[in-house]
């Protein structure tokens, strides 16, 4: 095992521990991965974090959802790269299921949509053209919404109408 695998497994462990709903089984699966990758704290302690340093910086801004998406994407790519490894497949599947439960609210449709976007080939000119064409709508969806509500004024209370107002006894005269 090279150092990169060890670091990635440790980061996976830390991310999974931070948000697991059923922590005990997931922690056991993470420990299994740590043993497989020999990723104890002493083995990977001299290296820089893979994703945690970025996550810490974003937490200061309070805007973590964007970076959470990137980190989850990273781990799903890692799981895909490790697919077929019988020694750790059970652990990876359990952790993947827990991430889906926590990040996608147990929605397979949301997970499938997320994965389909991750797999889009960005070097394809037709995809590039379609994506640029959709960009205005995407930017509109992502930008903060300004709620412009017109206030409706009641004409009955201000002399502008002759409707009865049940809350104003003077309007019945």
Curated annotation (Swiss-Prot):
GO terms for molecular function: cytokine activity; type II interferon receptor binding. GO terms for cellular component: extracellular space. Released primarily from activated T lymphocytes. GO terms for biological process: adaptive immune response; defense response to virus; humoral immune response. The modification Pyrrolidone carboxylic acid is found at residue 23. Its main location: secreted. Type II interferon produced by immune cells such as T-cells and NK cells that plays crucial roles in antimicrobial, antiviral, and antitumor responses by activating effector immune cells and enhancing antigen presentation. Primarily signals through the JAK-STAT pathway after interaction with its receptor IFNGR1 to affect gene regulation. Upon IFNG binding, IFNGR1 intracellular domain opens out to allow association of downstream signaling components JAK2, JAK1 and STAT1, leading to STAT1 activation, nuclear translocation and transcription of IFNG-regulated genes. This is Interferon gamma. It comes from Meriones unguiculatus. The gene is IFNG.
């Amino acid at each position: 095992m090279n150092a990169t695998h060890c670091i990635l497994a440790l980061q996976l462990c830390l991310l999974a521990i931070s948000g697991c709903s059923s922590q005990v089984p997931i922690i056991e699966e993470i420990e299994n991965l740590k043993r497989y990758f020999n990723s104890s704290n002493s083995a990977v302690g001299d290296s820089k974090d893979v994703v945690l340093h970025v996550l810490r910086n974003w937490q200061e801004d309070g805007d973590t959802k964007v970076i959470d998406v990137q980190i989850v994407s990273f781990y799903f790519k890692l799981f895909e790269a490790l697919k077929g490894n019988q020694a750790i497949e059970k652990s990876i599947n359990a952790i993947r299921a827990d991430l889906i439960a926590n990040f996608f609210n147990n929605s397979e449709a949301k997970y499938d949509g997320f994965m389909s976007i991750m797999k889009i080939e960005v070097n394809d000119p037709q995809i590039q053209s379609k994506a640029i064409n959709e960009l205005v709508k995407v930017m509109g969806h992502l930008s903060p919404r300004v709620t412009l509500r017109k206030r409706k004024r009641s004409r009955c209370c201000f002399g502008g109408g002759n409707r009865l107002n049940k809350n104003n006894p003077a309007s019945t005269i």
